Amino acid sequence: MITVTFFWVGIVLGAIWTFYRVVLYPYRVSPLRTLPQSQRGHWLWNHAFSEFLQPIGQLHAELLLQIPNDGMICLRGLFGAPKILLTSPKSLADVLVHRADDFEKLPGERKILRAVVGDGLVTAEGDVHYQQKRKLLASFTPPKIRALYPVFWKEATALTQQIRRTLTHDGSGIYTGTTDMVYWAPRVSMDMIGAAGFGQSFHSVRDVDSEIIHCYEKAFAIGAGHLLCVFADTLLPRIILQWLPWPRWRQFRQNIDSIQDFCHQWVTDAKATSALGDGIPSNLLANMIHTGEYTFQELIEQVRTFLAAGHENTSSVVMWVMLALASDSELQSRLRQELQASLPEVELDKVDLAILEQLPLLNAVVSETIRLFPPLPIGNRIAIRDTTVMNHPIPKGTPFLIVPRAINRSSELWGPDADRFNADRWINPDTGRFNNHGGASSNYSFLSFFHGPHNCIGQNFARAELRTVVAAVIRSFDMVLDNPAADVSPVGWFTPRPADGVKVKLRSLV
């Protein structure tokens, strides 16, 4: 009888606790209850899965403009659980910079990233992150990046030469044809990070059967089935997955293991070269080894991280910048004139390619592409202690959404043409020089590389890659879209790309 009584007491207490946590606390007690709330969620799970809706970040961009707010909007997940959408430079500055130590990536997100891109800088937090970034900064100084321009240019010109080989010669020295830049973008990005990052010659551009490219295409495939593989690989014990009749997961795991093996071999090669003491370090990995501050396994993890970040992110932006230029013949012509004036065909080998950093329109095109199409369209943080944002109390465990796609396209921050590709916003009309703000009033209006301690350490490396690819392609070809009516909506969860690809008609120029 006593056992039965305790059972029912437990049931009643559990029901009371559930009612308090699900109904009373979120809407009557929590300090977050006074924030503007979204009413657009699903009737059952509210906004619990809003981060996965395609295009990524589009819903949040709409909420940002539709719901009056002072910098934060409270979205609700399962059972009324809060999720705070940051919407203003002030709230972003608090989370990313002023109180950065109070926030970390979600544990689940870090676990997924660790499985896919390695246990490097991207997944590190706290003092571990500080120490890793401190050691890595020496490899990403402006002089070190400028020294890599000849490497980038070599790979970019290899791209244009290989594209030319796929075109048809008309007998008068002109090559014409159609190609899809979605095919070429990951290959040239892989070759660039291979050469400049690790001292490796992948030849992905000319090798149709490039093993490293195939591994990455399969490991980072687009689709819900692939995303399920990533979650399962992260959340379920390997011994259970190995017994399941799931060929797709096995292929995913095999590709991730192959990438790990590649990284192991590259580090082995680089350390052997370093031991010979032959010359000044000429790539990122060689610079890291030269410091003597890394163990062998730490080098492997950082290489995995930089391979994923340096390849996938750059590849995505290359696709979008080619789409933008192929869609605007006038902009393309202006850019070509600027490039031809600064990079004459005669004695090009004697030109300091770092001059690309000084070209206003080239840098404007690159910045505008990164603004409109950030490689990472959404990110998460969680409060690891009780804190405040814009003087508003935030309980420990509160998750936050940081959505570069929404912030970068906010008409309140970028003006009425925020959704339109307008490279000229990055050029001062009075001087004709490049500016680094695009007309926005705050640097937090541009979130593509985030800000603060966790900003992207490789952003200048990525910009240098993009400058050289754009310069090489636009100097070599005239481009127009093969099908202007094609669907160019962003698809994919990690690094979105145009849904129907970037099919362009090319005509050789040099």
Swiss-Prot record:
One of its GO terms (molecular function) is iron ion binding. Glycans are attached at residues 313, 408, 443. InterPro entries: Cyt_P450 (IPR001128), Cyt_P450_E_grp-IV (IPR002403), Cyt_P450_sf (IPR036396), Cytochrome_P450_monoxygenase (IPR050121). It is found in: Membrane. Its cofactor is heme. The chain crosses the membrane at residues 4-24. It is a single-pass membrane protein. Pathway: Secondary metabolite biosynthesis. Heme binds at residue 456. Keywords: Glycoprotein, Heme, Iron, Membrane, Metal-binding, Monooxygenase, Oxidoreductase, Transmembrane, Transmembrane helix. Pfam families: p450. It is an enzyme of class 1 (oxidoreductase). GO terms for biological process: mycotoxin biosynthetic process. Disulfide bonds: none annotated. Its EC number is 1.-.-.-. Cytochrome P450 monooxygenase; part of the gene cluster that mediates the biosynthesis of the indole diterpenes penitrems. The geranylgeranyl diphosphate (GGPP) synthase penG catalyzes the first step in penitrem biosynthesis via conversion of farnesyl pyrophosphate and isopentyl pyrophosphate into geranylgeranyl pyrophosphate (GGPP). Condensation of indole-3-glycerol phosphate with GGPP by the prenyl transferase penC then forms 3-geranylgeranylindole (3-GGI). Belongs to the cytochrome P450 family. PANTHER family: CYTOCHROME P450, CYTOCHROME P450 12A4, MITOCHONDRIAL-RELATED. This is Cytochrome P450 monooxygenase PC-21. The lineage of its organism: Eukaryota, Fungi, Dikarya, Ascomycota, Pezizomycotina.
